[in-house]
Swiss-Prot record:
Coiled coil: none annotated. This is Serine/threonine-protein phosphatase 4 regulatory subunit 2. One of its GO terms (cellular component) is protein phosphatase 4 complex. PANTHER family: PPP4R2-RELATED PROTEIN (PTHR16487), PROTEIN PHOSPHATASE 4 REGULATORY SUBUNIT 2-RELATED (PTHR16487:SF0). One of its GO terms (molecular function) is protein phosphatase regulator activity. Residues 192-203, 221-230 have a biased composition (Polar residues). Residues 75-105, 192-283 are annotated as: Disordered. It comes from Dictyostelium discoideum (Social amoeba).
Length: 283
């Protein structure tokens, strides 16, 4: 984690830089840009910090402009050389007095003229965009919301190989809402919160992991917990049902059997009495 750097010494260096006629960006001033590119926090007054950014952007855009002009000149020179060679070969070749000029020569001349016009239009347009951007930047009252990205573009400008692409990239940074810079007291508080926040997040993550491990319930356990305990119903003294129990059924069956046996005994005794009476009568 990168903390916000603030010191009165750097602030004085910024103030002195603003007063210089021939400005020189020291390593200490470059460290301010590098710190903002990592934290996104501006803790120095924008009116002095803006001078540093303006100088660096103007310097970088000048580099791109010179490279663009040099590249355009090289392209034009190459085209001119090709045209000259074609013209010389056409002149050296035997031609009749009535033969017209070579069509290829006409095409090369037109291409050269179009390339010159294109380069002039592009260069004038880019220079105009550059001037408008720098003027708007110098008039800004607050740091852009994307100041972190702006610092990254200042530090890593060599990643861009095109003048137009870099100019469009920095121009977008200025068209975003602005925010006030932090005071020195707010910087101290911000750094404290960053440190305590990292410790709090690590402890919270550990607690959350432990709680999750403890309270995790498998689908089988959850299903068993949702089902009622059948034993508490089957063996509860207060449990009732509309169906007779097995004990009641067996008791009723036993009583019926005893009654039938008694009835059979009575009938047997009656039969024995009748037989005895018949035997006496025969004698």
């Amino acid at each position: 984690m990168t903390l916000v750097e603030y010191s009165e010494t750097l602030k004085k260096s910024l103030e002195e830089f603003c007063k210089q006629d021939k400005k020189v960006v020291t390593p200490e001033l470059n460290s301010i840009i590098e710190n903002i590119s990592k934290t996104g926090i501006t803790c120095y007054p924008w009116n002095i910090l803006k001078e540093l950014f303006y100088f660096k952007l103007n310097e970088i855009l000048d580099i791109f402009e010179k490279e663009y002009i040099a590249t355009s000149s090289t392209t034009t020179t190459s085209t001119t050389t090709t045209t000259t060679n074609t013209s010389s070969s056409s002149t050296n070749s035997p031609q009749s007095p009535q033969s017209p000029q070579s069509p290829q020569l006409n095409v090369n001349i037109k291409d050269e003229e179009m390339q010159k016009i294109k380069n002039q239009v592009n260069l004038s347009g880019l220079i105009k965009m550059k001037k408008e951007f720098l003027d708007s930047f110098k008039e800004s009252k607050l740091s852009p919301f994307t100041v972190q990205r702006l610092c990254e573009l200042i530090i890593n400008y060599k990643m861009y190989t095109s003048f137009s692409k870099y100019l469009c990239a920095v121009e977008k940074m200025l068209n975003v809402s602005t925010l006030p810079h932090l005071t020195p007291e707010e910087v101290i508080e911000f750094n404290k919160n960053q440190n305590s926040g990292s410790r709090l997040n690590s402890s919270t993550n550990t607690t959350t992991t432990t709680t999750t491990t403890t309270t995790t319930t498998t689908p089988t356990e959850k299903g068993n917990n949702d089902q009622p305990n059948l034993d508490s119903f089957a063996f509860s003294s207060s449990f009732t049902t509309s169906f007779p129990s097995d004990t009641t059924s067996s008791t009723s069956t036993s009583l019926s059997t005893d009654q039938e046996m008694k009835d059979l005994d009575v009938e047997q005794q009656k039969d024995d009495t009748d037989n005895t009476a018949n035997e006496n009568e025969s004698k």
